[in-house]
């Protein structure tokens, strides 16, 4: 990751890019005797090779038309490709910046798990939970977001490439979040949440709010690592049970995990003054500014990220309520096991949930502190200051964050009062009220009328099947493309 981030040329970037992919492959398959882990790491490896093929084409195109792989030289020579086109065949004219931008972004689609190259990330949960927290939520999986932001001088030359990035990001943000609502594995709920939040970052890139994308990347690293490690703590306390339907009532057994996961969830849904509020709200406001002066793609993206707030709230509070509230459903499972094992002296007390040791809970507390305050203290320089001066280039006509700053950032009396004013903006923002609606609905269903969840599931059987089938993307990749390749090879 350090090589990837610190590189000053495309070649070194590519080596770092591939090295973190190798690390991901090896760590997903850490428990290699498990067939599911072996399949998951192979799936991640192959899907990312599809993205990396596009990334290589993009790098080759940069070298061909700019004559260098050094960032400084390439960005200084963008005038060589600005407004230029080429003919791949007679009568066809393709924009060079668009060609480069789309191929580079295909690499980001693989690394940062954007539709349709997202299918590997949920399966990466087969790896150890700290790995899920570190590289599949906080660092490696966001490398594609970093890369596109770093290449902003190229993307600013092509509105078509930006629109492509925006459409893919909006689709990922909304539709993968919906899948999280029907998941029962606690780690997979957080995994689909990660997919959705990566979509939000990509939307920020597509509306030229590169600083907002990196800002959300940073705040997301804290609260999503907290949620993953919190899920790991629950799994430890539940003796490696991951099905939320077999949990319930854990708040009295795991108080530290319970409180810290509440903090992570409140940051994720964008609760005012929590870290996620500042970064997510800035992305949605930037998308709104782009929708006001753009076309149907910009309008689609704005509504996708806006409605995604409600979806995020629903699956997040569903996870909390199924895990920490309600009846202690794990007792039914343990009693059933005790009945089967009565002749073997089975001890039901051995399965009693318990709080995780300090080596697990201390990182939760530290991440919870950051999830509370990091956004408030960094929103000024990262979004509206000169923190990225010289590293990110935005054309004046694309500067959606300027419109956001004009609307909500008033630092005449210092950054503290400006950050407080940004925090108080929630009163007039639909984002807060959508998140609150999701909270209220989920609270009513899972705390006061649990049978309603089953009735809704039965009434919406067809949409639920579509979501449980993940829109058929796994079938497309495994049975269609991979299976088709195998059949073709057999015939040849």
Give the location of each predicted region:
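Cytosolic juxtamembrane amphipathic/interface segments immediately preceding
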Residues: 241-248, 345-356, 412-420, 487-488
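Hydrophobic alpha-helical membrane-embedded segments
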Residues: 224-226, 310-322, 434-458
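Hydrophobic membrane-spanning alpha-helices of multi-pass integral membrane proteins
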Residues: 141, 169, 264, 363-374, ...
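Aromatic-capped, Gly/Pro-kinked transmembrane alpha-helices
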Residues: 380-434, 444-492
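Hydrophobic transmembrane alpha-helices and their helix-loop junctions in integral membrane proteins
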Residues: 1-16, 22-350, 376
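Long, highly hydrophobic alpha-helical transmembrane signal-anchor segments
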Residues: 196-206, 277-296, 402-438
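Loop-to-transmembrane boundary segments
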Residues: 51, 257, 349-369, 473, ...
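Polynucleotide-recognition surfaces of large bacterial nucleic-acid defense/processing enzymes
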Residues: 297-310, 352-367, 371, 424-427, ...
């Amino acid at each position: 990751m350090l090589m990837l981030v610190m590189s000053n040329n495309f070649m070194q970037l590519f080596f770092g890019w591939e090295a973190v992919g190798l690390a991901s492959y090896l760590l997903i398959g850490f428990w290699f005797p498990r067939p599911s882990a072996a399949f998951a790491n192979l799936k991640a490896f192959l899907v990312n090779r599809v993205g990396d093929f596009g990334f290589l084409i993009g790098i080759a195109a940069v070298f061909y038309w700019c004559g260098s792989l050094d960032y400084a030289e390439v960005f200084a020579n963008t005038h060589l490709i600005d407004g230029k086109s080429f003919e791949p065949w007679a009568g066809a004219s393709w924009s060079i910046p668009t060609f480069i931008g789309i191929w580079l972004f295909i690499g980001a689609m693989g690394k940062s798990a954007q539709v349709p190259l997202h299918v590997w990330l949920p399966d990466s949960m087969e790896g150890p939970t700290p790995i899920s927290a570190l590289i599949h939520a906080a660092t490696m999986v966001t490398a594609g977001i970093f890369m596109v932001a770093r290449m902003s001088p190229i993307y600013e030359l092509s509105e078509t490439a930006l629109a492509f990035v925006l459409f893919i990001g909006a689709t990922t943000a909304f539709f993968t979040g919906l899948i999280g609502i029907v998941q029962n594995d606690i780690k997979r709920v957080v995994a689909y949440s990660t997919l959705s939040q990566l979509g939000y970052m990509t939307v920020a890139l597509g509306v030229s709010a590169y600083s907002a994308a990196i800002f959300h990347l940073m705040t997301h690293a804290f609260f999503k690592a907290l949620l993953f490690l919190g899920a790991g703590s629950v799994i430890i306390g539940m003796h490696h049970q991951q099905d939320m339907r077999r949990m319930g009532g854990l708040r009295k057994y795991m108080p530290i995990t319970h409180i810290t996961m509440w903090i992570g969830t409140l940051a994720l849904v964008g609760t005012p003054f929590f870290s996620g509020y500042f970064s997510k709200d800035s992305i949605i406001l930037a998308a709104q500014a782009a929708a006001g002066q753009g076309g149907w793609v910009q309008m689609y993206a704005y509504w996708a990220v806006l409605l995604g707030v409600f979806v995020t709230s629903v699956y997040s509070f569903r996870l909390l309520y199924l895990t920490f509230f309600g009846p202690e459903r794990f007792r039914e499972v343990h009693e059933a096991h005790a009945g089967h094992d009565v002749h073997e002296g089975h001890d039901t007390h051995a399965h009693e949930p318990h709080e995780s040791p300090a080596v697990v809970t201390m990182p939760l507390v530290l991440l919870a502190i950051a999830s509370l305050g990091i956004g408030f203290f960094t929103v000024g320089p990262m979004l509206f200051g000169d923190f990225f001066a010289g590293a990110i280039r935005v054309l004046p006509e694309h500067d959606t964050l300027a419109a956001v700053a004009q609307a909500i950032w008033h630092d005449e009396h210092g950054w503290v009062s400006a950050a407080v004013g940004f925090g108080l903006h929630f009163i007039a923002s639909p984002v807060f009220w959508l998140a609150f609606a999701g909270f209220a609905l989920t609270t009513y269903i899972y705390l006061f009328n649990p049978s309603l969840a089953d009735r809704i599931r039965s009434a919406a059987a067809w949409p639920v099947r579509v979501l449980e089938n993940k829109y058929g993307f796994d079938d497309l990749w495994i049975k269609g493309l991979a299976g088709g390749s195998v059949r073709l090879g057999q015939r040849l």
